[in-house]
Amino acid sequence: KPWEWGDPLELNVPETLKKAMAKGLERLSHEDLVIDLAEYTASMSTVVLLDCSHSMILYGEDRFTPAKRVALALAHLIRTQYPGDRVRFVLFHDTAEEIPLAKLPLVQVGPYHTNTKAGLELARTLLKKMGGEMKQIILITDGKPSALTLPSGEIYKNAWGLDPLILAETLKEATLARREGIPIHTFMLAREPELLAFVKKL
C-alpha cells in the first residue's frame, strides 16, 4: 500500500521503483513510497549503498544527482519518522567507504569502476555493529559490477560485459547477506536486460 506517516518503513522496492521510473527519480517524494504491511513494528537498521562510479554520469545523463536525492529522502524519512531506527551510508566505486550523512550532499562521481561486492561486504559489517531486530540493505546503482578487491588487495577491473569472476564473487556476497537475514532492495537505474537479470539474483 502507499506509505503513510507512522507506517513502519518496510519498503516494497519494485513497486516504489515503478513509480520512480514513471515520475523520474528527481521528483520522487514520500507519497511515491510503497510499503509491505507488517504485523508488528520492530527496530530496523539500514545501510544505503550508493554507486558513485563514472557510469552514473556517462553519455550526458546525470543519474547520480537523482540517486543522491533518493538517499537523502530515505535518510530524512527514517531519521524523522523512525527515531529508533538506524541508517548509515556507504559509497562504492573501486572500493567502498562509509560516509557521514552531512557529507553526502557534497559527494561527486569519480573516474571509478563499480565494486559492488566491496559495498555489500562493508554494509554487512556495519549492520553487525548496528544491531536492531531487523536489517536491510538499500542498493542504488545504474550498472553492472566491474571491479573486485582480490585477496592480495589489488583491485581487479573489467568494464566489458559481465565478468564471470566479478559476478560470481558479488553474488556470493549477496548470498551471505541473505543467509544473515539481510534483504537487499535494489534501485536499478539502468534498463539493460542483462543488468536487470543480474539484479534479480541479488
Task: Annotate each predicted stretch with a short phrase.
Residues 1-47, 54-55:
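Negatively charged sequence features
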Residues 7, 11, 57-65, 113-114, ...:
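Ordered, soluble secondary-structure elements with a strong preference for glycine-centered loop motifs
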Residues 17, 39-101, 104-140, 145-147, ...:
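Von Willebrand factor
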Residues 20-24, 52-55, 77, 81, ...:
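Conserved, well-folded catalytic cores of nucleic-acid-processing
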Residues 35-39, 127-128, 174:
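Short, flexible, glycine/charge-rich loop motifs used to bind or transfer phosphoryl groups or to couple energy/partner
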Residues 57-61, 101-105, 149-155:
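Short acidic, glycine/proline-rich loop/turn micro-motifs
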Residues 111-113, 143-201:
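VWA/integrin I-like adhesion module and closely mimicked acidic/polar interface patches used
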